[in-house]
Regions:
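Bacterial N-terminal signal peptides that target proteins for export
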Residues: 1-8
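N-terminal short leaders/motifs
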Residues: 4, 17, 24-26
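Bacterial N-terminal signal peptides
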Residues: 8-17
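Metal-centered catalytic cores of metalloenzymes
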Residues: 22-139
Length: 139
């Protein structure tokens, strides 16, 4: 139960921290600044079905934000990858920022681990497109 409440609290913080002013800088891939293409940092494909092409500032690993782009290089979501061990330890996140701007809806799902974030974690996906447009990254 505490884990669920932790995930819900993190989601609330993330939605409230969406920064519309920064949205213009990350609207199209590749984003500027310290962001690097995830596929150039770890062994992952350039485009992940269901997620898109990911960019991250390596200093923010493992949590992110990861910026996800569709095939037309348009930002579709901001993803945070929150390790279970941090949720269980009731870690506080008060400095997470969602640079992608307005959030349409949120998805949360478990992941057992993958290159880049090998430990079990939750993906918290802040979608910047309507639910019907999630298909832009389906394949």
């Amino acid at each position: 139960m505490r884990r669920i409440l932790g995930v819900v609290a993190v989601c609330g913080i993330l939605v409230l921290s969406a920064l519309p002013a920064g949205a213009q800088k990350v609207e199209k891939a590749p984003p500027g600044g310290p962001y690097k293409k995830v596929s150039e940092l770890v062994k992952l494909p350039d485009f992940l079905p269901g997620i898109g092409t990911l960019y991250v500032d390596p200093k923010t690993l493992p949590e992110g934000p990861f910026l996800a782009y569709d095939h037309q290089e348009k930002l579709v979501s901001t993803i945070f990858m929150i390790p279970l061990k941090d949720l269980d330890a009731q870690k506080k996140w008060d400095d997470l920022a969602a640079p992608g701007g307005k959030v349409d809806h949120v998805s949360i799902y478990y992941n057992a681990g993958h290159p880049g974030v090998p430990e079990p974690h939750y993906h918290i996906v802040l979608w910047h497109v309507p639910k019907a447009q999630e298909q832009l990254v389906a394949k």
